Amino acid sequence: MASLKKSLFLVLFLGLVSLSICEEKKRENEDDAEDENHEEESEEKRGLLDFAKHVIGIASKLGKRSEEKRYHPFGKRSEEKRYFPIPFGKRSEEKRYFPIPIGKRSEEKRYFPIPIGKKKKKK
């Protein structure tokens, strides 16, 4: 009877040891799988963060651009043109303020599309 008890305890002990070893390996595998999932999630989060930074950068550039257009509707210029938007010089001012030639004939053409003058007689 004593030998049966010893053999039974031996089998029980070996079974428990092998069971604990298997459970330990299973936990390690689960931990590895969780680590891999965590790494993938962190990579996805990093990708989303990079994408979000990119989108925010574009939005800020568009905001700056609209603000520039608000104050400088023709884009950035050199310092002189920024503070003196009217071009200097007689010729450029004439072009700016008098885009239509100021001759009598040109005014007639502009305001009277029908030719004024003698009518040609048909025979």
Curated annotation (Swiss-Prot):
Residues 26-46 are annotated as: Disordered. Keywords: Amidation, Amphibian defense peptide, Antibiotic, Antimicrobial, Secreted, Signal. Residues 1-22 form the signal peptide. Residues 30-42 have a biased composition (Acidic residues). Its main location: secreted. Belongs to the frog skin active peptide (FSAP) family. Brevinin subfamily. This is Preprofallaxidin-3. It comes from Litoria fallax (Eastern dwarf tree frog).
